[in-house]
């Protein structure tokens, strides 16, 4: 089976790296694990916090569990750096648990892509910060962030 091709392809420019970051943000904001997993190689390697994953099946299961726990999830990613087939991003997302406790999670990701533009490695470090519901900043309807919505830098995050 041939893998799909997911432009833009490496080596990245500032413009194509930013496109990759926004595409990933938009996909994660759909909360569709099966669709999201298609952006990764079939044998993609992940470290998310202290959890290690291998392959699309584990990615799908991980994302299903994540969004069963992290409710009303809204994510913003921002390009930090890029070189050849690698991209570094910083991000923040807001969510609440089933008890109504709100959090803003801050983190950094390192991504490595194959020649088809599929992510083959994702390394994520994340910290959760409790917030009051009134402190929330990400209020758009479910789905991708509107183009005119502020990004991380505009919020000072």
Regions found by a protein language model. Name each.
Residues 2-12, 61-157:
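A beta-strand edge to alpha-helix "cap/lid" segment located at domain peripheries
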Residues 15-18, 33-87:
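A solvent-exposed, acidic/Ser-Thr-rich amphipathic alpha-helical stretch
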